[in-house]
UniProtKB/Swiss-Prot annotation:
Family: Belongs to the UreF family.
Protein name per its UniProtKB record: Urease accessory protein UreF
Record carries keyword Chaperone: yes
Pfam families documented for this protein: UreF
Keyword Glycosyltransferase attached: no
Functional description taken from the UniProt entry: Required for maturation of urease via the functional incorporation of the urease nickel metallocenter.
GO cellular component: cytoplasm
Assembly and oligomerization: UreD, UreF and UreG form a complex that acts as a GTP-hydrolysis-dependent molecular chaperone, activating the urease apoprotein by helping to assemble the nickel containing metallocenter of UreC. The UreE protein probably delivers the nickel.
Keywords in alphabetical order: Chaperone, Cytoplasm, Nickel insertion
Length: 210
């Protein structure tokens, strides 16, 4: 395994200090309302977010960032695609923490940007295949949502791992498609997930930031 790939694995690890564990992407609201109540419903909810929501849009943005597209323009797109204030906060706060940590580790100048753009700028010099980077990013995103479900549904640890494993084929498909997708393909249709993010903003009792 190359040092470049190991660097990417480190950056996308749950141990990397982006604070990802504190964000549920609206999943906390869906769980509290009973929309997500077991492993099967958690898998469906996360799959929809991956295929039709932030998973796909972030993957396309990341692909273009890896290829050197204007980071300011991509950052503006990422902000515009955030369907709720908490979603914007999620991508900006994680992106800023990610960029600051990678900059401290590498000595590179990496300004704070939305997470997929920050990751793309950081990972571009690694020279890894675009679809491979996208797949690892999507896997980290899905794993974080599964972790939230394990803690809050709650699911058993084995159920959580089975849920994540069941998403692997979908993650590979989205990564392959998004690696070649133009920016014109950007868009979201994960309506229930977007509504959950909006409703979480006024949820009175919560343990997640989003």
């Amino acid at each position: 395994m190359s040092a470049a790939l190991l660097s990417l694995v480190q950056w996308l690890s749950p141990a990397f200090p982006t604070g990802a564990f504190a964000y549920s992407h609206g999943l906390e609201w869906a769980i509290s309302e009973g929309e997500v109540r077991d492993a099967a419903s958690a898998r469906r909810w996360i799959a929809d977010v991956l295929a039709f929501g932030a998973g796909r849009t972030d993957a396309i943005l990341l692909a273009h960032a890896l290829r050197g597209h204007d980071p300011e323009a991509l950052s503006d797109l990422a902000r515009a695609l955030a369907p709720a204030a908490e979603r914007l906060r999620e991508t900006e706060e994680q992106g800023a923490a990610f960029a600051a940590t990678v900059a401290a580790l590498t000595g590179r100048d990496l300004p704070p940007r939305p997470l997929p753009v920050a990751l793309g700028q950081a990972a571009a010099p690694l020279g890894l295949p675009v679809a491979e980077v996208l797949a690892l990013m999507l896997h980290a995103f899905a794993a974080n949502l599964v972790s939230a479900a394990v803690r809050f549904v709650p699911l058993g640890q084995t159920e959580g791992q089975a849920t994540l494993a069941a998403l692997h084929p979908l993650i590979g498909e989205i990564a392959a498609e998004s690696a070649e997708a133009p920016l014109d393909a950007l868009g979201s249709a994960a309506l229930r997930g977007d509504l959950a993010a909006m409703r979480h903003e006024t949820q009175e009792v919560r343990i997640f930031k989003t």
